[in-house]
Structure formats: C-alpha cells, structure tokens
Regions:
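Bacterial signal peptide processing site
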Residues: 31-33
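A short helix->beta-strand "capping" segment at the edge of beta-propeller domains
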Residues: 45-66, 97-100
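Beta-strand-rich domains and repeat architectures in extracellular enzymes and scaffolds
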Residues: 59-91, 105-117
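Surface loop/turn motifs at the tips and blade-to-blade linkers of beta-strand repeat domains
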Residues: 61-66, 104-109, 145-151, 189-195, ...
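Signature of short aromatic-glycine-proline-rich micro-motifs recurring in repeat-based ectodomains
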Residues: 70, 200, 246-255
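Conserved beta-strand position repeated across blades of beta-propeller domains
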Residues: 72-74, 115-117, 157, 204, ...
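Conserved beta-strand positions in repeat-built beta-propeller and related beta-rich domains
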Residues: 80-87, 118, 123-130, 165-171, ...
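Short loop/turn segments that connect beta-strands within beta-propeller blades
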Residues: 95-99, 137-141, 179-182, 224-228, ...
Length: 281
C-alpha cells in the first residue's frame, strides 16, 4: 500500500511463521466450536479444491482521478466513496461514480490515509502507521472523532448482517471489530489450498464473503468469512493499456454496486475505473 520500502519488507514475510499461525488458528477454532480438528481440516480442504478461477468482463469504463493514490473504494446507494493515501496527499471524497467528487476532506500530514467503509450516517477511515482511525459524517465528511488503532491500517469493510467490521493489516489475517469501538472481537486466517495468503489489502464485504486485493498484484481473492477459505481467485490484470500502466501502480479498489452483481475496480494513480462482472475464465 505504500512505497518501495514497504514492498521489500512485506515480500520478506516468513512463510514458516504463517504456516505455524495457520495451525494454531485451526486448533483454536475447533476448540471453540467443539468440532474435531480432522473434520474441520477436511472441510477446509474440500472447499479449497473448489476454488473458482475467475476473470473480469468489462461492462463500462469511467474516468478516474490519475492523481488519486486509491486506498479504499465503496458504494453506498448511488454514491461512491474513495479514500486516498500518501502523507500530505491523503483525502476522502464522495460523489457519483466517474464524476468529480462533490465533497472532499483532506488529511493533514503526516497522516497516511488507508481503507474506508460506510456505516449508514457515518464512516470509518483508517490510517497506515499513524495508529488512529477517524470517524466521519458520511454526508459532509466532517471529522467526528478519532480512536486509537493498534495495528497497521490497510483495508476495512462492514458486514451489517453480522454487526461487525472486517479489517486487514497486510498479513494473512482478517480481524473482526466492533463497529462502534473498533475493539477486536475475533480474527480469521485466510488460506488457499491450506496455505496462508499474506498481504491482504483493500477489502469489500458482500454477504458472507470478503473480497480482498492481494498486494502488490492485480489479484483478488474471495474469502468465506466463516472459515477463512479462499473460494475464488480473480485475475484483474490487463485492464489498463501498457502506456497507462507505466505511471499507474497496482489495483487497489473494489466496490460492489448495490443491487447488482457488478463491481467497480480501480487502482493507485489509475486514470480509469471499470464497471465489471467477475466471470469464469
């Protein structure tokens, strides 16, 4: 989500530690719900074998601010919310998709804006390593309060049916949080074919699934929010031309279009936003 130093650090994440964490998480989960480890592991393995391989079908192309270092994207009704990053350049904005924002709020340096999610009349905006989360009015974007946030802030989305937020921190774990206090209420290790999937970034909650960008790539995984198992991999590469990609960075914006099976996709410094369907490859 940040610059080259962050890339180097995250690409060096040890897979052995992640595998150990996967085993610990599995045992803890089984102990909590009374199911045997063998049964739980078998179920996860079966789900992993049915991982869908999806691509994108472009339905439309919209303009996007090429100076927006996109960190979060979400639709609420017909309004598109976008959070951007970089110290001294971070902002949050709202407006109709593909048009200039009607409301914008900038973050003062050195704050580095990250993921966003809307909860009715308010929204949350995370910061990367500033250890604060900002609650805002969803209509005016006025700041309402700040709360301490112990982890790195990456992605966030809201599961209203479960009354919780889902957040990422660049690891293979998703953390569940109270939507009012941001207190952690649980966590989930995300796995693909039994292996942890690190560097989970921008998130989008859709029903009981969580869509997550895998940084730094053009890949999206669809995660079962109950088990942590990846149920689909989505290849979103090739949306930009080679010339457009020279200045742009990776995909980092997923917004489900309410009432449809469509999504809006964009990325950091992308000049375009795409209205797409996820389809079998």
């Amino acid at each position: 989500m940040a610059r080259s130093a962050r890339t180097r650090a995250l690409l060096a994440l040890p897979t052995i530690a992640a595998a150990a964490l996967a085993g610990a998480t599995l045992l803890a989960s089984c102990a909590a719900d009374g199911r045997s480890p063998v049964r739980r592991q078998a179920a996860a393995g079966s789900a992993a074998e049915r991982v869908e391989q999806l691509g994108v079908r472009v339905l439309g192309v919209l303009p996007h601010d090429p100076n927006a270092y996109t960190q979060g994207l979400e639709m609420a009704g017909r309004t598109l919310y976008e959070g951007t990053g970089l110290a001294g350049e971070s902002s949050i904005r709202l407006g109709p998709p593909g048009r200039p924002p009607t409301v914008r709020a900038d973050l003062p340096a050195p704050l580095f804006g990250e993921g966003i999610t809307v909860l009715g009349p308010t929204l949350w905006q995370l910061t990367w390593r500033d250890h604060i989360a900002i609650e805002r009015d969803a209509g005016t974007l006025a700041e309402l309060r700040r709360l301490p946030y112990a982890q790195e802030g990456w992605g966030v989305c809201h599961q209203p049916g479960r009354g919780r937020l889902v957040t990422s921190d660049g690891s293979a774990r998703l953390t569940f949080r109270d939507p009012r206090t941001l207190a952690p209420t649980g966590e989930l290790l995300v796995t693909l074919h039994g292996r942890p999937v690190p560097r989970l970034n921008e998130l989008e909650c859709v029903g009981d699934s969580v869509y997550a960008n895998v940084w730094p790539s053009h890949r999206i995984v669809r995660v079962d929010a109950g088990t942590g198992v990846v149920t689909a991999q989505i290849d979103a590469s090739g949306l930009l031309t080679s010339k457009e990609q020279q200045r742009a960075e990776v995909l980092n914006g997923i917004a489900a279009v309410p009432g449809t099976d469509e999504f809006l996709l964009t990325g950091k410094w992308w000049p375009k936003m795409f209205r797409v369907l996820f389809v079998a490859r």
